């Protein structure tokens, strides 16, 4: 009996290691790519970020500086913390002025520091 157990133990590893080459598996299913009948679904691109802020500078050509405000609740103390960030945005027609409330959309890098573009002017400054 002990001899039979040793021979069957030796035979088992050789049977599991003898897999067909090229990643093909019996039944037409590949380990890497899934079943053949499964259609490939293109990955959906994430939506672009939209932000609303106030123009603080319009002195550059076709560029505005917009102050974006972000409010978050402190995880431990619960206080509302207000943080601001200034970003450069592309204004093709140079229509936005200082104090305007504008809507921005994230876009591909347009320059070393410009990654936003003006979508619309929500409210003109008085």
Curated annotation (Swiss-Prot):
Keywords: Ribonucleoprotein, Ribosomal protein, RNA-binding, rRNA-binding. The keyword Calcium does not apply. One of its GO terms (cellular component) is cytosolic small ribosomal subunit. Residues 1-46 are annotated as: Disordered. InterPro entries: NA-bd_OB-fold, Ribosomal_uS17, Ribosomal_uS17_bact/chlr, Ribosomal_uS17_CS. It comes from the Bacteria. Residues 1-23 have a biased composition (Low complexity). CDD domains: Ribosomal_uS17. One of its GO terms (molecular function) is rRNA binding. Disulfide bonds: none annotated. GO terms for biological process: translation. Part of the 30S ribosomal subunit. PANTHER family: 40S RIBOSOMAL PROTEIN S11 FAMILY MEMBER (PTHR10744), SMALL RIBOSOMAL SUBUNIT PROTEIN US17M (PTHR10744:SF1). One of the primary rRNA binding proteins, it binds specifically to the 5'-end of 16S ribosomal RNA. Belongs to the universal ribosomal protein uS17 family. This is Small ribosomal subunit protein uS17. The lineage of its organism: Bacteria, Bacillati, Actinomycetota, Actinomycetes, Mycobacteriales.
